[in-house]
Amino acid sequence: MLLIGKKQRLKAIRFAPEGVFLDDGAEGVLLPRKQVPAGLRTDDEVEVFIYNDGDGAIMATAMEPKGVLDDIVALEVINVTPNGAYLQLGIPKDVFLHKSQIRNIAEPGDIKVVKLILDYDGRLAATELIESWLDNAELTVVEKEQVA
C-alpha cells in the first residue's frame, strides 16, 4: 500500500520509456526516467518519496524531500495565489498551503514553519496552524547533550 507523503522501499516491476514502474500492489507507480538509479534492474528495491502530481496522479521520486508527512519543517514560499501559497519541498511538486491554514500573509521568499499533512482529498499539503502539535514539556537534556 502506498503512503502519500512518506518514503518507502518499492520493487522495480517494469521499465518503460518514461521511467520505471514500482510495485504498488496494482498497476505500478512511476519513477520518472531522470530519477532512476543507474544499474536498477527488475525486482531491485529503491527508496522513493510518494506524492501526487499536479493532476492528482500518484508518483514516486528519488529526490530527497525537505520533510515527510507529519514533520514540522521550515519551507520557502515559491508562489502566492488567491487561494494560498506554494512551498518548496525539494521534489518536482511544491506543497500547497491553503489560505485557511496560513497564519500571516505569505510573500514569495518568506520562510513558513508548517506541518506536512494530508488534505481532504488525500494529497500532501501544509498547515501553519501547528500549536496543537507542539509540546511545552520541560526539557530533560543538558547543554551539549546529543539528542536523537
Label every model-predicted segment.
Residues 1-148:
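Single-stranded RNA-binding regions, centering on S1/OB-family and related RNA-binding modules
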